[in-house]
């Protein structure tokens, strides 16, 4: 990394310019801290001796004369406009012009590459005596004149060339003014850029001093200012245009009482004495940094960017395409579904009602309020994706620029490359999905480039980074560190705010920080003046962002936003940690040098701190408990921060209490130790860094290192010192050896160990290690299950895994795998197959409704339990209900639970399981759900289990245990108010089907008899079992038995089941006046339906009539099958709706044809110009832009210029071919030369190949055509398209051609026609999927 001050050998030249006389008056050259002989040789100027010239050449190089001369870059003022002029008109290749001989002054103040133009103003002040508010700075860059602010008039840039001052013919108070500025003063806006531009490679700037105009005319100006109109002409027509640092009041004071400026406006005119003192101190400190930079970089560079010494904890990557892309973010939002993987989306766009924010989220997530409440500047879509519990945020703007951001744990040690790689992997599938949307997302063609594409620029910003200085300080040393930063504060390099915490030094680094958003001050002011807040008029109506120099309210907000980057330095036991917040990668490299030069100076050089203030890393001793634990956590947080992986885990300080924690050393520390001390160390592993670590146990009472197993959530072994050494052949010896070799102790290790060493069964109530067994609680084993088994059999609970990556409560999953004797992944794969079913929604008593399809549910199961790439946290325990149902379906196994929460044991069983238990064929497993975890119950013999883990987990009707479970289930059976199978006891009738709802409950039976149609027999919602009776998930059938047949069955039923007698209470009649059923009274209160009849059955004559305005079956139909064929009336409405929008569809095809015809022609013209241009020669470039301006507008020229500046000419041509320009939209003008009849014939010729003619319109559903695109490129299923052509009835096409011709020839219709490119019929109509929740907000 290069870190040098180029301004030492190529100094900044500041030339004073007098606009009144249009002449340059004096040049100041900022030499900085050069050697004395160089300074002396410079100051001799015209009297330099050959020796002086030799000194200057040796220091500045062969071109020393040019560096110290008075060249001005650029041509005459007529040739260049601020930010606008793109080429010069002179024919020569050299654009440097020698100025007339003027006085040259030399300043010893240093200029640094990290100086902003705000800093430069202050240094000009101390060198020239011209205070900042009187300076109008301009300079030349890329042959264009530039200034340090932007003046906008009605949103458009105003050309700012002070050299045009004398061309203004209107005068007020003896000063030339631009009167047009005053007439539009309310539309003016000044954007201060001084703080957001570095001097960097600019070596010559010019300053126009306002005093050269004001001082000679002060009396005339004062008189003119007495008239408000003339004052406004002066202020807006001259001061705001060229010296915008002055407010109107400050300008008045400058004219009337200039000596009061320093007192009234200290930010505009700071104390010269104080400023000189501060700048000299700054110069001393920064020069020291540059002097030591290369040495420090060489010392630490090898480790600076490695994963061990750098940790990016948050970052934002900005992807900027080189080509113009128009993306319809509204359509992307509409077409992109919310899923458990991408559960939150937000879009901002301009709808027919104005600025609009729409958010949607999956039902497993919450509304993204944080993002929907943001202030947006341009149409934007935000997508939030979760991977392994981590949120990744993608923000896409309508110009194709997009941003990716996320956060990481410091322990993950992400460097810059891994951050980019991680974010790229996250973004690629989403970008592919959006690109597949075709013209619906990209109405003018193109696609979003991937981060790996060559046609983009990538920048990393908004980073939070931790880096580590590999030395440590004593408490006194850290206090000394803090005190040394005070000089930097006095120099203005940093600022310190608020109270400091013990062991942390917090400050803002200000110097050289410029990558801010200049518009953030506007947003903050809008927020601070928003609804419910008292509005400050001066702030709320901010017209000039230089107001921070003359308005205290704006200054406070400015300092909050642009006050520097937050830096925290942590005093740690093992090193010094530095955190940098919200920085760019460029700023990190810059700040790192400053910070490490400062820190290295603490231990090297003449100014190093005392030895007793340094902690000796190579001679660690057993410290106090807190510091020792902190040292371990600092060096290996992945190992010692147990709650990072499990919030319920016991912390290390409890597992290994003082003074038993060991001392950890790195390999570098071990190398510097004496050989005798190295022999005492035990080699282990650093899990955070992925490198060896070494441990010692210095406390005399606990000299032996041991490794604790089964405590860490990831099965890492935890070092802890013990009194005695583990003996050969013991359990502890086996565990220590396994841990030292493998670094972990897992289930298989435990099985091997148990086989060799375990001889006992655990007591109930303890956490059960994997493959260990524990006794049941005595009230279950000795009371409830008394006499159900014989010795030597015992009841036990078997230990299984309780956690996995992505889900913390995985005990049930592992219990089911153990019960079924399956590998966990094999179980997940099988039940995922079963989940991919059309009836997925019934799983978990309707929990499956959270998903849009069985495939989505199956995919999430595989991601979570097989690939372990996802997480089910937002399901809570719902996933368990789904798994239990899937196991029942796949293996015909049902589970009952004993839930022991805080010692209170309860028996729990689901209604569907009760049905199975009470049926003749049954197979169950018993599971214990305790505070320590979820474990399966088994019957085994202790010796047999220790030998081969053999046990019985599944119980059938032949097992005595089943009798106990069955009796308890009968007691809990409340939901089936009669047994479905008892219907078989009614002669002549059988149950033909069970009707099941979306929550997996049976709600009715279809009873078969000797008639053709089944009897509809409703029951109270009930669980059911899978038996020989078919089940049906469809709607209530329409073809059912008559009232007579239904009543005949009910009569027989009432005789057999008097306790459930069915008594009608009201007759049901539909809107057609047909009698369709009755409502029963009593315990049931159910709706009984029969075939519609016009005659009221005699049995029901005396009952009240209840009219059903809507049949409940129709409601169910609308919910379950929303896209079914609509009613005839709806068909007519949709047909009319379709006809009304056919003209819009035709316009889309028309413009698509025109874009291809005209833009291809223009591109060929540009390509020819490219091939004829030598971009190495200014004359050739000038000719290129001149010819280009003949057929493209200024905005397109800017775009082409930007592409040429950011890439080489050869590649630029490829970029241009993909780009979208304004000339792509200028389509209608060539057609206006036609007559009406000629145009009609021309349009027919253009459009007929795009049309599929037919006689009449078929049924069309409105929801499918809300988003429409050209049929030629559509990737959507659009009913108006067939074979990539637009379907239009023959009798309509001719009419549309005549309407289109009339619209083209009518200039008032141009804007209306071009607006059709949006491609949306109703921009506030969105696709609403079953698992999505959408909310809309207007942003006024």
Curated annotation (Swiss-Prot):
One GO cellular component term: virion component
Main subcellular location: virion
Keyword annotations from UniProtKB, A to Z: Transcription, Transcription regulation, Virion
Keyword Transcription regulation carried by entry: yes
Superkingdom, taxonomy of origin: Viruses
Locations listed in the record: Virion
Summary of the function given for this chain in its UniProt record: Putative initation factor.
Family of this protein: Belongs to the asfivirus G1340L family.
Name assigned to this protein: Early transcription factor large subunit homolog
Organism: African swine fever virus (strain Badajoz 1971 Vero-adapted)
